[in-house]
Amino acid sequence: KNHLDYIKKVHSSGNSGIYGVSAKNKSDLVETKMAELRQRHRKAMTSGSTQERKRAAVEKKLLTSYSKWRGTRYVLGGDSRKGIDCSALTRRVYREVFNKELPRVSTQQVKQGTRVSAKNLRSGDIVFFKPGNRTNHTAVYVGNTLFINASSSKGVVMSSLKSPYWRKYFRYGVRVHNV
């Protein structure tokens, strides 16, 4: 089944699907970025270069993984659908999307690849944040400023690097794969 048909099916079903944001976590910023991402996917799949189609395929896999975890509550030290923390979510998404094992904790995940700036992020990069005195929050970048995030207050949600909070605490990305 081709990518564009898949996106149309998800949205025409009335189900928010892989692009959805649960009602309690809706934000105009995230919804706008999701709409832009959908438009970029349509363009990539109909007239994009090989690299753009590859990126769209990775984004689709990331969003499919997100749909499995969306709404899972945050539990420090958790590593299941009953509750998960940020580094476990990053590890699980990497396993599902890239068939790659990452270390369990963020302090080890940060050592797995090459650091990249916000402007050079690619789909699948791990993003790190420093909300306290050390870099200790991790998430997986999807594209168009969006990342899969295990929020301590909201559970697994889609967040944006454009939000004032995340922009303030963003440290760097780490590229672990070649996409």
Regions found by a protein language model. Give the residues of each.
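A conserved glycine-rich beta-strand in the N-terminal activation segment of trypsin-fold
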Residues: T138-A139
